[in-house]
Every structure is written in structure tokens, then in C-alpha cells.
Amino acid sequence: MFKKLVFSLSVLTVLLSSCEKDLGNLGMGIMPSADILEVRIDSVSHLNFKYIPDNTDDTIRASQNFLLLGSYIDPIFGKVRSEIFAPLYFSNPVIDESKYQFEIVRAILKMTYNDTSFVYGKITNPLISIYQLIDSISVDDYRTLNFKPSHETLLLKKQIEIDLLSQTQADRIDTIDLPKSFITIIDNYIRKIDPKDAYSIDLGPDDVNKVFSKKFFGLHIRTDFDDAAIIKFRDLAIDIKVKIWDSENNVDTLTQEMILSDYVDRENYIYKQPLVKFELKPSSIITENIGKSNQKNVYIQPMKGYKAEFQFPDLDRWLDSSKVAINLAKLTIPIETKDTSDYKPIPKLLLYIYEKGGKYPISNCSFTSREINTNNQYEFFINDFMTYFLKKGKSSSEYRYEIVTPNNNLYANRSILLPENAKLHITYTKYK
């Protein structure tokens, strides 16, 4: 009996030592032999929200995502436009003039999509404007909000029909015949490429395209119809139809394809990648309330619009709780559920917490719509921040809290949050 008692006490000692070690990792070690543990639940209800413009880089690299093109009028955020900057390569070497004579007879822009393509806004046949870029665009230009190139030439405007109602998932291609002026431009550029460069043993197709891209800077494609939709295109290319004949006047036709290029000229600090940029013209609902706190609704607009900042003024009372270990800290933010049938729900929000003046977040987490329960709310778990907060002992006002949508979130839509009902739920262990 005595041996069993000694064994039981030994096991209990090991378990309590392990508990002390784990809680110590949270930054608040305890002495199990002296302290009484009690699990409690509390909440912080007064979160002070405001929304502000997100003026950071509004560029989406289409090579990593998809090509988003279109425009629409959001009932809250106003006019939103997505446009494409498309540098283009030849998929194979250009024609060798030393062997053939040639004539470009047709140029066709191909835009590929299917019924799974993302549509944001009302499905309407958009008016497409296609410009030729006259000069290269620097990295800094691309990173400028609402940037517009100063040197470009309008090639054409054309209304196209978008069919996203079919039940098939097969690719569909909308084609636009490019004008004679574009054919002349491409013809002149091809003839300026030295055949020695185009067919040198030391140069491959990419090297030839680098020569070509110094002469042809690509296309700028946008829609001029305000209340349409933003559509996700899977691909964009140009077919160049060419008639060739040899020294014996044998005639043939072939197709040279121009495809999207995908590299960065780091030496000259110039992008050679397809990029998507967004233009935003806010409505009065936004402009009248930017920066104001305690709004009934807080609007989060992705695709470079607006983000929310908030404060935890009631969080400082926890600084007096020196004998507390955080088990769970969950921030819940309800979502406005009014009808938005023309707009898909936002699938993701990101929460970032920074030290004031800090460039990089000390805590970050995300929440997607797939995880939204019947309570229609976002939930963020910030245990790591609460532990950090209690350990540092600084006021909550020394931190910056942001809710944003990711730049590359193609399926993003506006989010209408209800800050009055936002809460931070805290489950903790208290000992004394």
C-alpha cells in the first residue's frame, strides 16, 4: 500500500511539473503547489472602428493570378475598374527575311474564358478599348495608385459579347480583329529585327523576344463602359496571320502567335509581365466618412479600396491581471446580411496587428467565408497576440490593428462589417 502511495505521488509530481513548464512557455509560470487554477471566460466589447483608404501597391501580377478586365458601379464604393497591361512575346522566332518575303494579312486578339470565370457585377457586354503602349513602364509607375500611362495610342474601341450563362466548362474565346494600323506596327517591328539576332546560334526565342520587346512595349486594355462586370480571363494572345513566299514564288500562310511575356528586366528596372491594376472612384457614402470612428457599418473594399483600423480601448484592464494564462482569444465581427445578389460574398479577410510605427506585423491571421457559420460572422484567433500583449505590459494604444483583404484575392468582394457587435472573447486560466 505504501509503495502504491509513493508511486502515485511521483506521477502527480511529474504531471504538475509538466503543467508548470507549459504555462511558463506562455510567459507566466506558476507554482502548482501554491496556486489555485480557475478557468474563466470574459469579453471585450467596445472596439473602436474606422475605415481608411488603402494606398499601398495596387498591382496584381496576372502571371501569378488571372487577367481581370472590366468595370462596374458598386452601390457603396462607386466606380471600380480593372485594366490589363500586357507585354507580348512571339511564341516562336520571327520570319527570316533572308529566306522569305512576307506580308501580315490579319491580327486577331484572343481572350479565353469559361463559365467558371469570375464575374463581379452585372453581366453586360462591355465596350473594350485597346491601346498600344508607346514607351516602357517602370516598376514605380506600376506601383502608383490609379496610374495612367502618358504615352499610348488608341487602336480601337469595340463592344464584345460575353457569354457566361452556358452550363459547359469548355473554354470559350472572344476574338477581336485588330486594325490595319496595328498590323503595320507589328510588320515594321519584325522587319527591324536583325536576322542575325533572330537566328543566331547563341540566341534562343526568349533572346529574340527581348530584342522585340525593346521595340514593342505591349497593349493596355480597359473597358469604357461603367456599369458592366469584372471578368476573369484565363488567357490572352494575338494570332498574326502571315502570307509568305520563297524565291520561287511558292505561296504559303502561317500563324505566328504572340503570347504574354513573363519576366522582369531587373537591369533596367522594367516589368515585362502582364499586370492588372484597379481604379477606384469612391461614392459619397465613403468620402463623407473616411477616417471617422464608431460607424454603424464599416465597409472593406478589396482590389485596392479601403481597409479598417480599430482599437481595443477596454483591453488595458487586462494589464493588471498578472496571474493569467490565455487559453483562447477569439475576435468575432458580424457581417451585414442584406441582399447583395449581384455580388459574390467576400471569401477572405486578413487581420494584422503591428506595434505602433512597426513595418511588419507581430501577429496575423485570416478567415474565409467557407468557415462562416450560421451566425454570419468572421472569427479571428489571436491567442499569440494576447500572450505577447500581457508579457510586454504596454497599453493597447501602442499597437495598430488592421483588417484588410488580400491584393491577390481574385474572388474578393466588399465586406460590410457591424463593429457595434464586434467582441473579443477570452478564455483564460486565473490563479492566485
Predicted regions located by residue number:
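Secreted, disulfide-rich extracellular signaling modules
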Residues: F2-T13, C19-K432
